[in-house]
Curated annotation (Swiss-Prot):
The EC number(s) this enzyme carries: 1.6.2.-
Record-annotated disulphide pairs: 76-173, 216-266, 225-249, 241-262, 272-322, 281-305, 297-318
Binding-site list for 3-hydroxy-L-kynurenine: 38, 96, 122, 134
Organism: Sus scrofa (Pig)
Protein name: Protein AMBP
């Protein structure tokens, strides 16, 4: 029997940004990340780099002008066109005459000064209906929380996790100017190594750590690949394991699948003096923490995010880590005071 691929149904009720202000969306944006149900995206992801989007007043009151720059085959191309306004503020139509299709674009989330998330619906005879999400930033780099918000939006509309990518930043391109294509090794080194270590020509792009704990003091590294895989890294300053998006290849050893694995590998005894933090999320996980006032390990409810190193997964682990004395040790301590 032949199994047919599921047919994507495009959502009809895409909600635009509340109280959308058209004039505030004008100006320059950097294309930071993309996700799509279109099958070509994964095939061409290695050729994609960050471009720009310029929005402004159109030739008529019914239009807004659109100018896009991106690299194609080493040359910076410029594409100009117009979005057609609709009766819904924040929803636009874009006609692609080459393919004779009209796309619907929606501004679904934006704070105007920092980021904007667009969703675009398209129907083509070749690929059928497709849905594409794009994350734009006023600057090429955005906060990790905004990348996570974009990922959740994309997943929420049915875009597969392996079809969500960040765009490599190779600097802003100059229209018409041809640039040399970097080698794979130079791309990898630029993504992984600190600036002062580049160009040494010695060693491998990523250090070979024999012990995972040796990596705990490194900063996190996304690596040169374009995936958006949620991982944890140990932040020595906050003494907590925090999330970042891993590209899927290379990077370094400060990269953990779970918060538990990260904490059990990297935290130090100083974690025992940290406050007990439930975090802002609304999960319900019973964990152990060391209460420095009482001098003992206690149960607490962890919400599931933004905790710190003072959280343990068993009473035994907490006592062993924070040096909680047994009865004989307590007697010895009392007699020595």
């Amino acid at each position: 029997a032949v199994s047919a691929s599921p047919v994507l149904t495009l959502p009809n009720d895409i909600q635009v940004q509340e109280n959308f202000d058209l004039s505030r969306i004008y100006g320059k944006w950097f294309h930071v990340a993309v996700g799509s149900t279109c099958p070509w995206l994964k095939r061409f992801k290695d050729k994609m780099t960050m471009g720009t989007l310029m929005l402004g007043e159109g030739a008529t009151e019914r239009e807004i002008s659109v100018t896009k720059t991106h690299r194609r085959k080493g040359i910076c191309e410029v594409i100009s066109g117009a979005y057609e306004k609709t009766s819904t503020d924040g929803k636009f139509l874009y006609h692609k005459s080459k393919w004779n299709i009209t796309m619907e674009s929606y501004v679904v989330h934006t704070n105007y000064d920092e980021y904007a998330i667009f969703l675009t619906k398209k129907f083509s005879r070749r690929h059928g209906p497709t849905l594409t999400a794009k994350l734009y930033g006023r600057e090429p780099q955005l906060r990790e929380s905004l990348l996570e918000e974009f990922r959740e939006v994309a997943l929420g509309v049915g875009i597969p996790e392996d079809s969500i990518f960040t765009m490599p930043d190779r600097g802003e391109c100059v229209p018409g100017e041809q640039e040399p294509e970097p080698t794979l090794l130079s791309r990898a080194r630029r993504a992984v190594l600190p600036q002062e270590e580049e160009g040494s020509g010695a060693g491998q792009p990523v250090a070979d750590f024999s012990k995972k704990e040796d990596s705990c003091q490194l900063g996190y590294s996304q690596g040169p690949c374009l995936g958006m895989i949620k991982r944890y890294f140990y932040n020595g300053s906050s003494m907590a394991c925090e999330t970042f998006h891993y590209g899927g290849c290379m990077g370094n050893g400060n990269n953990f699948v779970s918060e538990k694995e990260c904490l059990q590998t990297c935290r130090t005894v100083e974690a025992c003096s940290l406050p007990i933090v439930s975090g802002p999320c609304r999960g319900f996980f019973q964990l152990w923490a060391f209460d420095a006032v009482q001098g003992k390990c206690v149960l607490f409810n962890y919400g599931g995010c933004q905790g710190n190193g003072n959280q343990f997964y068993s009473e035994k682990e907490c006592k062993e880590y924070c040096g909680v004395p047994g009865e004989e040790d307590e007697e010895l301590l009392r007699s020595s005071n």
